[in-house]
């Protein structure tokens, strides 16, 4: 209603829900405006009744409405999904999606947030972007970040992509998922060329959220997650393991006729399953170590609060995120007032501010920080060389410890131990008495950017300058270093019932004794090689103009980076990059990119290099002959594109490769009497190679983007082929004679070819009853082949690495079983433990035909441990407040090596790996394991090589979102309640 010059109205979305914070401004005069309140209402004073208002909101189509003469009028804004997708983040800038001719895929923070219960961005990316391959090797709290490759592996030195957060090289772990606006993955040469020596393995651009003009919007999210081990080996219990041991001993009687004495009587074996009393239960243990060590589930929590909004002068986004990851290991009472085990807590804070200093000047400030607090048993940190061993001791119960060797803890409080084999550990004791240590990682990142519109010089010209400073500080070894475990350790001999106590021996007195309890409280120390600092500054010019149907853009950038770890000499990089694009009528596209890069990792002669790329595109759907299909909404968009270029990589493992290096050799003297004429001497530890330079990769890419039937079907097809040259081969991997005297020089001698394709299909359908169903499906195939790696020239072809994939598995090839002693005698003999072979062993192929099975007969088998094919399918629906989706992820063409050996070290650990061979003609799954005898390592054949293919139900969710009624009365725009699960089911071979 218009009373004099006052206008009242309400802003709604297409579902009839009110919109909070919508912008309402007078057309032609942005100084007259307001925003809608919590109920979507607004009041605005306008000059006259003929005024026109522009109503807008992020992610929706803006509306122009004329002021009505009476009554409260309503403005309905519709979702603008095309608007949300029309801008793609590219290297050092943004481009309209329609004009992108490079291989770039993008997802949003909203998509990543579907993976509730996952706090790591890398893990959340799994399956959501074609071409991105993730491999997670650890579930330790705080160590869940997966290894990421883009389009597979192309170098044995380094295949990690460059990760940039808001334009600066930073780990993705420094950002919480709720703060992510978008993630772009740059895959081909045209997309990555502006990064020069840093872009050979692809680039991941993480863009964080920023504020928009309007009322403050507060978002609160919280979830609790229960985690259980996904898959553990199936071990036989004591009864079945001892029965299996008797079978194995009988099988070996021809080698050891006196081994009858090792066979357990059935009456004794029965006691392991059905002990008569506590004494028998302790003498004849039957321990399910997995049940002892692990909780039924571990709890993890994640909570986030963020607020965004702003005025014409300042726009803001601020976020606080908390993560807690619980421990699967159970808690044991150790009587020492501390609990060992694992855990991780992290707090992330972020504030992004945009100041509109003048109409043409914007000053941006990003300040972020994180504090990660990781708890482990003492020395079980990934920064310590003993970590792998210590962690293995704690997991040994789940994998290796026999169920009958001892109890974790006896009724008198003594810990179980095994005196006959020193490396048999009590995992429960290790978890309980492992001490406790905290590793605190503090990260602070700051960005200051000034953006200036220079249209007063020439239309479309702008400049940007930025400086950033990051600091990472790590403190570890704060906690309890448990030096001596509990004094009471015992073992009960099941054959005699005799109790043995663990004792130590004093060399000075000759007495043995039981150690007492002792530990140190450690105050912590700075981890020098994990403390990092990074200084980066950039200056950039951009120009964008349209001349009729001719659209031109230019970008030029200078960047310098200084990084240092601990007290080392800083690393330096310098980049001069440019990009130029041209398109005619948004139909024909040309792009050329380049970068002149410098790195101090190489000699002055090789310190700088120029890398460039070009791309072309054709928007077929904009051609006049496609008008018939477009008008009938059969074809929405069809674009064909191609790119080619050369990119570099300076991410070599070692510095100073171009210099001769010397190391301390020792002291000596010039006389018989070492006190006279002493001197110190040094040795040449590494021979330098002044010609060491960048690894280079030439990338060729063809792509098709399509959309049909008004967006019902959309997607893309990519075909790529890369050739990487000048790959560094380390001195220890080179073929040189032993009399050279030291390692050979590291040199650029390697070549690898990578090829593959990507398929993506998106389905989106909204029905008349407002039900929406959608599906995103993708597949990536990426394979590589080593062309050269300085193999010894006289090696047989199958013994070389050239001709096979990086990481190609090799095995001794088996061809069925030895079914009789005639087979044993008539088969190729082994050069070690040949006399120990028996019927039931594998028939190992003499691959090189020299009559003997030895180390030279190991041949390529299966694939590498990086999958060639990855698949993703996400299906969902939305109707009114209800929503649900499921996501499946799968891989194939991958080989895993999992060596679980039954009866290892004569322990009664037996794995359920299928049926054993027992006589000729059996359809056996594996050979009959040994208990006493030893076979050569060749005899395992391919037993421990598995097809690593799997299909996983990676994510599933059912939810309901409240948007009106009681929710609005609480001042809440919407409230979502959901049940979500991750890695719920897996099928594997």
Across the structure, where does each feature detected by a protein language model lie?
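Glycine-rich, aromatic-lined ligand/substrate-binding cores of catalytic
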Residues: 459, 864-897
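C-terminal beta-signal and terminal closure region of outer-membrane beta-barrel proteins
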Residues: 746-754, 796-827, 913-927, 934-940, ...
């Amino acid at each position: 209603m218009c009373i004099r010059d006052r206008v009242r109205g309400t802003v709604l979305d297409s579902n009839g829900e009110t919109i909070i914070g919508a912008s309402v401004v007078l057309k032609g005069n942005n100084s007259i405006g307001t925003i809608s309140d919590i109920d979507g209402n607004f009041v605005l004073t306008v000059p006259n009744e003929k005024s026109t208002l522009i109503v807008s909101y992020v992610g929706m189509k803006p509306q122009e409405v004329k002021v009505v003469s009476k009554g409260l009028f309503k403005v309905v804004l519709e979702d603008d999904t095309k608007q949300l997708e029309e801008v793609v983040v590219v290297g050092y800038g943004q481009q309209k999606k329609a004009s992108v001719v490079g291989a770039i895929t993008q997802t949003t923070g909203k998509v990543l947030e579907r993976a509730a219960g996952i706090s790591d961005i890398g893990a959340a990316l799994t399956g959501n972007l074609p071409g991105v391959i993730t491999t997670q090797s650890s579930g330790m709290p705080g160590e869940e970040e997966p290894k990421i490759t883009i389009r597979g592996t192309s170098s044995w030195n380094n295949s990690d992509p460059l990760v940039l957060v808001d334009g600066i090289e930073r780990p993705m772990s420094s950002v919480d998922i709720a703060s992510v606006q978008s993630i772009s993955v740059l895959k081909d040469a045209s997309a990555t060329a502006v990064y020069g020596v840093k872009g050979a393995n692809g680039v991941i651009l993480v863009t964080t959220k920023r504020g928009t003009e309007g009322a403050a919007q507060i978002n609160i999210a919280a979830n609790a997650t229960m985690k259980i081990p996904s898959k553990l080996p199936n071990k036989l219990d004591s009864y079945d393991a001892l029965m299996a041991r008797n079978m194995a001993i009988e099988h070996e009687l021809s080698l050891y006729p006196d081994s009858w004495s090792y066979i357990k009587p059935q009456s004794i074996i029965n006691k392991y399953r059905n002990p008569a009393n506590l004494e028998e239960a302790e003498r004849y243990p039957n321990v399910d170590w997995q049940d002892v060590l692990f909780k039924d589930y571990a709890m993890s929590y994640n909570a986030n609060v963020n607020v965004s909004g702003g005025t014409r002068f300042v726009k803001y986004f601020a976020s606080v995120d908390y993560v807690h990851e619980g421990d699967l290991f159970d808690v044991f009472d150790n009587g020492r007032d501390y609990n060992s085990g694992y855990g991780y807590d992290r707090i992330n804070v972020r504030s992004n501010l945009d100041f509109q200093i003048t109409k043409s000047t914007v000053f941006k400030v990003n300040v972020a920080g994180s504090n990660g607090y990781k708890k482990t048993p003492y020395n079980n940190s990934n920064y310590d060389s003993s970590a792998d061993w210590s962690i293995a001791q704690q997991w040994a119960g789940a994998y290796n410890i026999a169920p009958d060797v001892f109890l974790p803890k006896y009724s008198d409080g003594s810990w179980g131990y095994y005196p006959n084999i020193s490396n048999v550990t009590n995992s429960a004791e290790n978890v309980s008495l492992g001490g406790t240590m905290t590793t605190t990682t503090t990260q602070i990142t700051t960005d200051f950017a000034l953006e200036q519109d220079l249209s007063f010089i020439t239309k479309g010209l702008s400049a940007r300058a930025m400086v950033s400073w990051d600091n990472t500080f790590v403190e570890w070894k704060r906690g309890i270093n448990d030096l001596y475990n509990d004094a009471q350790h015992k073992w009960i001999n099941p054959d005699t019932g005799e109790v043995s106590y663990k004792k130590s021996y004093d060399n000075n007195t000759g007495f043995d004794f039981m150690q007492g309890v002792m530990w140190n409280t450690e105050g912590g120390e700075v981890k020098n090689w994990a403390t990092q600092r990074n200084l980066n500054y950039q200056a950039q010019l951009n120009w964008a103009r349209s001349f009729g149907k001719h659209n031109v853009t230019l970008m030029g950038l200078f960047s310098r980076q200084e990084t240092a770890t601990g007290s080392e000499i800083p690393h330096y990089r310098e980049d001069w990059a440019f990009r130029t694009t041209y398109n005619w009528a948004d139909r024909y596209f040309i792009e050329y990119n380049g970068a002149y890069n410098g790195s101090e990792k190489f000699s002055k002669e090789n310190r700088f290099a120029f890398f460039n790329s070009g791309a072309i595109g054709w928007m077929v759907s904009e051609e006049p002959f496609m008008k018939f299909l477009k008008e009938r909404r059969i074809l929405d968009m069809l674009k064909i594109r191609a790119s080619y270029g050369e990119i570099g990589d300076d991410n070599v493992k070692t510095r100073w490769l171009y210099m001769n290096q010397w190391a301390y050799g020792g002291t000596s003297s010039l006389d018989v009497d070492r006190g006279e004429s002493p001197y110190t001497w040094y040795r040449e530890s590494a021979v330098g190679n002044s010609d060491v330079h960048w690894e280079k990769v030439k990338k060729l890419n063809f792509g098709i983007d399509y959309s049909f039937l008004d967006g019902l079907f959309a997607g893309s097809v990519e075909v790529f082929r890369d050739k990487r040259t000048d790959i560094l081969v380390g001195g220890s991997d080179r073929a040189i004679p032993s009399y050279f005297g030291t390692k050979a020089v590291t040199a650029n001698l390697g070549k690898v070819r990578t090829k593959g394709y990507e398929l993506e299909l998106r389905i989106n359908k909204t029905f008349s009853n407002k039900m929406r169903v959608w599906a995103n499906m993708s597949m990536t195939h990426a394979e590589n082949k080593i062309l050269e790696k300085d193999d010894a020239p006289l090696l047989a072809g199958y013994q070389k690495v050239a001709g096979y994939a990086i990481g190609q598995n090799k095995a001794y090839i088996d061809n069925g079983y030895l079914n009789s002693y005639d087979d044993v005698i008539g088969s190729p003999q082994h050069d070690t433990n040949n006399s120990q072979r028996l019927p039931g062993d594998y028939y190992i192929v003499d691959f090189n035909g020299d009559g003997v099975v030895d180390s030279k007969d190991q041949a390529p088998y299966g694939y590498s441990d990086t999958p060639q094919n990855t698949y993703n399918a996400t299906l969902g629906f939305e109707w009114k407040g209800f929503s649900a989706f499921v996501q499946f992820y799968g891989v194939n063409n991958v080989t895993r090596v999992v060596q679980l050996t039954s009866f290892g070290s004569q322990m009664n650990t037996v794995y359920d790996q299928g049926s054993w061979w027992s006589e000729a003609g059996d359809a056996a799954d594996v050979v009959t394991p040994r208990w006493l005898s030893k076979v050569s390592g060749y005899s395992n054949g391919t037993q421990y090589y598995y097809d690593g293919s799997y299909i996983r139900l990676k994510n599933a969710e059912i939810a309901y979102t409240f948007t009106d009624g009681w929710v609005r009365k609480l001042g809440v725009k919407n409230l979502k309640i959901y049940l979500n699960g991750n890695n719920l089911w897996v099928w594997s071979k």
